[in-house]
C-alpha cells in the first residue's frame, strides 16, 4: 500500500483564482456532506448494503455506496462514499485489504510447520470463488502480500493477512488447512485496513447519527466534519496531479490532460497507473490513467500526460477557458 510519502515535482509556479471553487475545508456543511467519505466500523450482523443504506438515511441523501463488500458475519473497515462522492469509489475498487482471521484447525498443528506453510502461501496464488459467491466461479490469480501468525492456542490460530482485492479469506484458510493435512475453517474475520485506511480511523454508525443531529439541532458541524472526511481523502493512496485553473473545466468535460495544464505532481507513477487530478485549491477533479511515466512527464512541454476515466467535480465549477481558446 502506497500511503503518502511521495515526492512532489513542481513544473511551474502558478496561482489560483479565489473566485472559482473552494478548498474542501471551506465548503458549506451541505456541500461537505455531499462530497464526503465515512469510514464505518461495520459490526457483525448487517450486510454492507444495509450499513450504506443506514448512512444514506441518517444523512438525508439520495445515495451512498461502499467499497469492498463485507459479509454479514465479518466486521471492520467499510469505506462509504456519500451522494456525489459515490463517483469516487473507483479509487478503491482494486485496493488491497488487511484482515485478522481466527482459524480453527481440525487436528493438532506444529507452530513452526504452520509458519512455514503460511510463508508458502505468500505471493501469487490460485483461487476459485466459493459456491455462495456472487461472481462467476472460475479459477483466478490473487496476490497474498503477507501472512503473519499472531497467536496459536491449541487448534486455534490468529492470522493477519494482507491480500489483493478479491481474495477470499475463508478459502485461503481452508487451503492452508489442506496443505497442513488437518483441514481448517475460519471462525471469525475482521478487516483492519482498506488501502491506507485503518480501523483506528473508523467511526460507528451512532457517531454519524449523533454528529448529524448536533448539526441539525444546534447548528454546530464541528463533530460532523470530524466524522465525515472530505471526498479528497479517497485518493490518499494515489499519485496526484495538480492542474491550472484553465485546465479544470476541460477535465470535467472528459478532455485528456495535456502537459501545459500540469503545475505539479507526485512521483513516481508509471504509465497506465491510476492517478488523481486536483485543483490548486486541493479539490478533487477526478481520476484517470497516466499516459506516460512520471520521469517523462517532468520533461514534457506538450503532448498528453493522462486520460480522464471518472469525473467527480461538477462542470462549471471553474470557467470553460478551453472553449474560449478554441474560439480565438
From Swiss-Prot:
Keywords carried by this UniProt record: Isomerase, tRNA processing
SUPFAM superfamilies: Pseudouridine synthase, PUA domain-like
Reactions accelerated catalytically: uridine(55) in tRNA = pseudouridine(55) in tRNA
Function: Could be responsible for synthesis of pseudouridine from uracil-55 in the psi GC loop of transfer RNAs.
Organism: Pyrobaculum islandicum (strain DSM 4184 / JCM 9189 / GEO3)
Molecular function via GO: RNA binding; tRNA pseudouridine(55) synthase activity
A GO BP annotation: rRNA pseudouridine synthesis
Active-site annotation: 71 (nucleophile)
UniProt cross-references to Pfam families, sorted A to Z: DKCLD, PUA, TruB_C_2, TruB_N
Protein name: Probable tRNA pseudouridine synthase B
Enzyme Commission number(s) from the entry: 5.4.99.25
HAMAP family documented for this protein: TruB_arch (MF_01081)
Residue ranges occupied by any PUA domain in the UniProt entry: 238-313
Phylogenetic placement of the source organism: Archaea, Thermoproteota, Thermoprotei, Thermoproteales, Thermoproteaceae
Enzyme class: isomerase
Stated family: Belongs to the pseudouridine synthase TruB family. Type 2 subfamily.
Amino acid at each position: 500500500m502506497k500511503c503518502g510519502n511521495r515526492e512532489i515535482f513542481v513544473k511551474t509556479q502558478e496561482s489560483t483564482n479565489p473566485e472559482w471553487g473552494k478548498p474542501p475545508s471551506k465548503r458549506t456543511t451541505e456541500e461537505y456532506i455531499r462530497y464526503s467519505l465515512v469510514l464505518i466500523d461495520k459490526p457483525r450482523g448487517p450486510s454492507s448494503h444495509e450499513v450504506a443504506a443506514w448512512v444514506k438515511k441518517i444523512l438525508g441523501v439520495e445515495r451512498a455506496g461502499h467499497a469492498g463488500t463485507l459479509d454479514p458475519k465479518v466486521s471492520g473497515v467499510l469505506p462509504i462514499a456519500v451522494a456525489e462522492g459515490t463517483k469516487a469509489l473507483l479509487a478503491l475498487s482494486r485496493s488491497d485489504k488487511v484482515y485478522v482471521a481466527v482459524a480453527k484447525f481440525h487436528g493438532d498443528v506444529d507452530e513452526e510447520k504452520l509458519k512455514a506453510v503460511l510463508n508458502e502461501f505468500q505471493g501469487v496464488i490460485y483461487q476459485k470463488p466459493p459456491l455462495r459467491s456472487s461472481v462467476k466461479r472460475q479459477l483466478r490469480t490473487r496476490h497474498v502480500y503477507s501472512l503473519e501468525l499472531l497467536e496459536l492456542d491449541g487448534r486455534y490460530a490468529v492470522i493477519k493477512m494482507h491480500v489483493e482485492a478479491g481474495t477470499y479469506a475463508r478459502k485461503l484458510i481452508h487451503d492452508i488447512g489442506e496443505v497442513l493435512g488437518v483441514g481448517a475453517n475460519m471462525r471469525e474475520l475482521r478487516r483492519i485496513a482498506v488501502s491506507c485506511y485503518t480501523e483506528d480511523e473508523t467511526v460507528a454508525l451512532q457517531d454519524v447519527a449523533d454528529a448529524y443531529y448536533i448539526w441539525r439541532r444546534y447548528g454546530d458541524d464541528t463533530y460532523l466534519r470530524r466524522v465525515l472526511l472530505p471526498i479528497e481523502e479517497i485518493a490518499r493512496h494515489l499519485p496526484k496531479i495538480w492542474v491550472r485553473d484553465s485546465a479544470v473545466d476541460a477535465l470535467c468535460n472528459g478532455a485528456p490532460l495535456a502537459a501545459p495544464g500540469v503545475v505539479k505532481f507526485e512521483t513516481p507513477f508509471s504509465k497506465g497507473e491510476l492517478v488523481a487530478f486536483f485543483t490548486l485549491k486541493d479539490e478533487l477533479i477526478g481520476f484517470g490513467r497516466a499516459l506516460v511515466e512520471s520521469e517523462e512527464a517532468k520533461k514534457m512541454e506538450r503532448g498528453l500526460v493522462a486520460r480522464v476515466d471518472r469525473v467527480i467535480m461538477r462542470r462549471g465549477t471553474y470557467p470553460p477557458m478551453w472553449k474560449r481558446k478554441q474560439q480565438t
